[in-house]
């Protein structure tokens, strides 16, 4: 395809914005068609109660892969980031707590109040993740190799990665091979004896998934996240103005590179002729001829809603149908008239003050059994009566999100299945919100009386309002059989599809985890290579 030909992208989520940016830099003419009135996908800021705004779905940034951040230069487009320290505050119902700082030695000092042994082990664990980071990080940036006929580039990438792994030594190589299939609960138990410490770290392996800490392969998910950020508890980066400001800056960077963006442009159908895409048709009937189409939406929506399934090979269609994408995460936003008090946050623990201690993420899930019980309910079609929560109070870093002196509390809620066994989400939405408030009140007893308003976003909402089939925040389950060369399906994990010049760039492609931009950048590289 000659340089300068039109490539049309479906959806304006973060990965699509990254893909379009690099396509423009590569000399193509990308056009993004976004069905909503603004871009951002799951990384947007919206008013959920009069005067109160929140990052509706995602509430922290990836972190964005460092090379992408350097290329897009988001700070030039008024993207201002905050990186709170400590990153995580983890209370227990009994009034104890841990704080996780950037400084591992300082964190270890707090852990020593629970276990002197674990204080030393925490340093060892952090060093282990830091040791693995360069190797695991490489995997985020490569295209999964072709299984049947790997290209010279595939072999070179595997050689580089293999050489790095070999450099770790036989013991560490054995550790990696053993750890990947393990349950996160077993993995953390090899290092720690303190239940709260185990739970906070194991939670990285289950966040956003339909798995509990005793599920096989959750250590692989934990290590996948460590490949993006080697800190034991992960990232806690926020954008001033909410994540909508982050994706707005991405859109401005893409426009500056030559990307055209149209909002309120819902794609109804992908046109195909003789096995190749020819363009798109919008819901209003408007047609867009295209030499190539890149879908930033999930595979099931792409192949079963935007394409005629009869154009697909039956084996491929069955694999896509079997791609697990039913989510178990909900989101609850609270409009508060004051900052809640957490009794576990004592002067002895919060040496830098309560505001700093609460400015990162707040982990609600005091032990492994608690996390597993929260997961159990979803296996049988119910939501957790005592859910695992990943909480932020973004107004501590950005007071503009609420009226003066008031606050926003935002909570990811697990586990809440897409399909309920009894009732429906419209009927049980309030019950889920009440459950979250009751759970939070265990740790912050004054919170219920501070609430002015509440918004509950269910997995069903993620499908109907945001277009995530099955309500999965990562477009598909992060399980061992749906990672790397099998994401989304075997034989088609290289961002291409069986339809010529139709590509995928969303979170259902490798590596498919959080706001790192990696799926989008990898897809752009393969698209440029295929079209030149």
Segments predicted by a language model, with ranges:
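A conserved FAD-binding loop/helix module that cradles the flavin
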Residues: 507-528
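A glycine-rich dinucleotide-binding beta-alpha-beta segment and adjacent secondary-structure elements
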Residues: 194, 198-214, 365, 381-394, ...
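A conserved short coil-to-beta-strand element within the FAD-binding core of flavoproteins
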Residues: 263-277
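Active-site/ligand-binding neighborhood in enzyme catalytic cores
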Residues: 130-257, 468-483
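Glycine-rich loop(s) and the adjacent beta-strand/alpha-helix scaffold that form part
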Residues: 236-249, 253-257, 270-271, 281-346
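FAD cofactor-binding and catalytic pocket of flavoenzymes
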Residues: 74-78, 306-410, 461, 467-488, ...
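Flavin-binding catalytic cores
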Residues: 313, 339-340, 376-385, 425-464
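N-terminal glycine-rich phosphate/pyrophosphate-binding loop and immediately adjacent elements
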Residues: 2-148
